[in-house]
Amino acid sequence: MKIAVQTSLPAFQNDIGDVVRLFYGEGAAVEETQQADARLTHIHEESNGEWRETFVLTDCSGRTEQNTLSAPVVSGGLEEKRQKKRLIKRCCYMLLKRLSGRQPAWGSLTGIRPTRLYYQQLENGKTRGEARHTLQDLFDLSQEKIDLLDEILDAQQGLMDRRARACDVYIGIPFCTTRCAYCSFSSGEIGDGRLVEPYLAALLHEIEACAEMAREMGLHIRVGYIGGGTPSSLTTPQLDRLLAHVERHFGALAEFTVEAGRPDTLDAQKLRMLRDHPVTRISINPQTMNDATLTRIGRAHTAKQTVEAYELARSIGFDDINMDIIAGLPTDTLPSFEQTVEKLLELRPENITVHTLSV
């Protein structure tokens, strides 16, 4: 079923489309001008201090079904957008749930870690029981998924730093040894490296400014993540200088991840340098263990090099390793993807992240 989505608030078009896809699958939400089996119209109104959201579904025969929800207006930046989005999605969700007869296990949630919502409820002073009711009443989570969240929270007790005035910092290194065919990130080939030193100088200055800003705001920096690009495309001295600067200005971190990224950028010297700093976690990202596919997408390493880099990291003492793979790469097939997964499972990294190719 294809549903043409029309809204008076274009900024929320994709959010409404996410809800449509919950019930009718990928490709169900289409532009208003495209041929569709039904039209979903969203009307936003604001009066007397209330938001009023109405969704009307009209089928090809002209028959209509609708749902309306209201809530007090919330003013102020990000929180205003968040609360308005929740109301819009909830109103749309309730209508489509009624008409489709379907019950998504995660309710109306799309594109968010549900544990974050659970923690937010607890940080706002609610008991676990009250937080569970909120997740069920506001987001329509199934009992099974709420129980799963409880299990996750129990497992994380003592591991998570939930100070209200805490923040996490991402540090981007926009350089790679080669550019992958599918890549849409703001990164480029490192080439002769002439841009690295000017970038590092600016980055070190920004780290100092970020640390000072956190102090002024009373924020504790909890987690650090250096990603890219490929951070390990920097030379060992360059990466050493960056890590020392992070330690000096951010202090002790509960978790500190460095994307070691491509196996061909790693050697014993660089891995030992990472280990000498308080790096608690690294990523070694093959994307696929199929050599033909690696060549096709522009990766300059082999599956064998991935295994060698992983085993070297283990021998140097890294006990928390993530490995990224991508499903749907050019020339990759279901059997070859299954082989990639099987090879990674044999290595037994602490975490495997599976991305789907998006062009």
Short names for language-model regions:
Residues 2-3, 20-22, 26-79, 88-89:
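Short, well-ordered secondary-structure micro-motifs within conserved domains or adaptor modules
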Residues 11-16:
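Short N-terminal binding/cap micro-motifs at the start of the first secondary-structure element
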Residues 77-103:
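Accessory, often N-terminal, substrate/partner-engagement and coupling regions
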Residues 99-103, 123-169, 217-218:
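N-terminal [4Fe-4S]-dependent radical SAM core
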Residues 171-187:
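Local cysteine-cluster metal-coordination motifs and their immediate loop/turn environment
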